[in-house]
């Protein structure tokens, strides 16, 4: 089986340790999926990336990299270059994650050329036919739904949204990672990790740190296109017990989760945060202001969701810091949850099974 995995734009930092380009969870997930496909004997995988340099890259032997187009190319130029690459490769399936106009056009293209298009939703907003960052309606979304062979969602909310609003069925496959044999949690500080975005509400973590001078806080917040980043950084620097970090290379970010006592999420909404996976795989309990996909924090007792209340978030932070038995219980459950639900090897096998079943049905 020949599979082409398309990495989202801004993925160059995953292939160059010196790059300061900011990327998100969708980039990491497609990188992990492509890497694991490369280890599967039954799959001939090609990883399609933008036309940029791939230097200082330790895992080159695990990828068959194919350069396609520049991010600055017009959409029809992208399509022409992409068309030529796909005609050379002749894949059985194409995987893509993260909603863009290109996604919808690609679904139509694959339908015309008899290629199974597998679309993976990156956030809850996408399942409602809206772009993740802007919230604007994706006008060509129905083209994607009508022509994609397989839709993969991250949680039951996304699956239900697609079914109720658009009559399309999907398959839940959660984010995956290469997991550890035992938890690494060391419990040194309270951690927040996300790019600068109004949806992530970073100012609330700064507020939390300022209210708790007895503990050390670390905030990894790379800049983005969102305004007022310098103002945020200056505000953070005024809080003595808060360390504000502008950038951490992809290969080093796991160390921050290993040493964290608690991970805090202040986002308005997300699909399944990549950071939840990074926290749980290290046995780090989670405090979330609002985000709780499939009620996993409460259902699996791996943290607390505070239903939008900063006061409750404060109370739960105090509780986790003062109750050693509760903390150890949640830490162990967090690690066990990741082992059962987020093994990239198991997830990739599920994707292969879906594509194989679809191919058999198609023929």
What residue ranges belong to the model's regions?
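N-terminal subdomain of nucleotide-sugar transferases
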Residues: 1-51, 210, 363
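Membrane-proximal helix-turn-helix segments that form the acceptor-binding/catalytic region
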Residues: 112, 134-151
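Glycosyltransferase donor-sugar binding loop
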Residues: 216-231, 246
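Nucleotide-activated donor-binding/catalytic signature segment of Leloir-type glycosyltransferases, i.e.
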Residues: 230-248
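Aromatic "clamp/platform" in nucleotide-sugar-dependent glycosyltransferases that forms part
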Residues: 268
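Short hydrophobic beta-strand element within catalytic cores of glycosyltransferases
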Residues: 285-289
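Conserved acidic donor-binding segment of nucleotide-sugar-dependent glycosyltransferases
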Residues: 300-311, 319-325
């Amino acid at each position: 089986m020949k599979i082409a995995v398309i990495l989202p734009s801004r993925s160059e930092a995953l292939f160059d340790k010196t790059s300061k380009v900011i990327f998100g969870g969708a980039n990491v997930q497609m990188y992990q999926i492509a890497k694991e496909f490369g280890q599967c004997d039954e799959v001939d995988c090609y990883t399609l990336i933008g036309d940029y340099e791939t230097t200082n890259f330790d895992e080159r032997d695990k990828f068959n990299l194919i350069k396609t187009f520049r991010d600055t190319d017009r959409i029809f130029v992208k399509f022409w270059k992409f068309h030529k690459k796909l005609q050379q490769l002749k894949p059985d399936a194409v995987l893509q994650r993260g909603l863009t106009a290109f996604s919808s056009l690609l679904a139509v293209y694959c339908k015309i050329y008899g290629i199974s298009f597998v679309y993976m939703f990156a956030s809850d907003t996408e399942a409602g036919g809206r772009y993740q960052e802007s919230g604007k309606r994706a006008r060509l979304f129905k083209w994607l739904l009508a022509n994609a062979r397989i839709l993969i969602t991250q949680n039951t909310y996304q699956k239900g949204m697609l079914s109720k609003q658009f009559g399309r069925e999907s398959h839940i496959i959660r984010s995956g990672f290469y997991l550890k044999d035992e938890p690494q949690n060391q419990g040194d500080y309270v951690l927040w990790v996300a790019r600068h975005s109004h949806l992530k509400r970073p100012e609330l973590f700064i507020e939390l740190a300022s209210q708790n001078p007895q503990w050390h806080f670390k905030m990894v917040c790379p800049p983005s296109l969102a305004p007022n980043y310098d103002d945020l950084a200056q505000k953070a620097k005024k809080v003595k017990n808060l360390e504000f970090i502008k950038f951490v290379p992809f290969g080093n970010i796991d160390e921050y989760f290993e040493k964290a006592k608690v991970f805090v999420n202040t986002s308005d909404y997300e699909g399944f945060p990549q950071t939840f996976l990074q926290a749980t795989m290290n046995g780090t309990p989670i405090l979330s202001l609002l985000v709780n996909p499939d009620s996993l924090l409460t259902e699996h007792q791996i943290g607390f969701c505070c239903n939008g209340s900063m006061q409750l978030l404060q109370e739960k932070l105090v509780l986790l810091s003062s109750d050693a038995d509760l903390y150890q219980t949640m830490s162990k459950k967090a690690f066990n949850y990741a082992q059962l639900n987020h093994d990239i090897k198991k997830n990739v096998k599920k994707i292969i099974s879906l594509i194989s079943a679809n191919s058999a049905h198609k023929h």
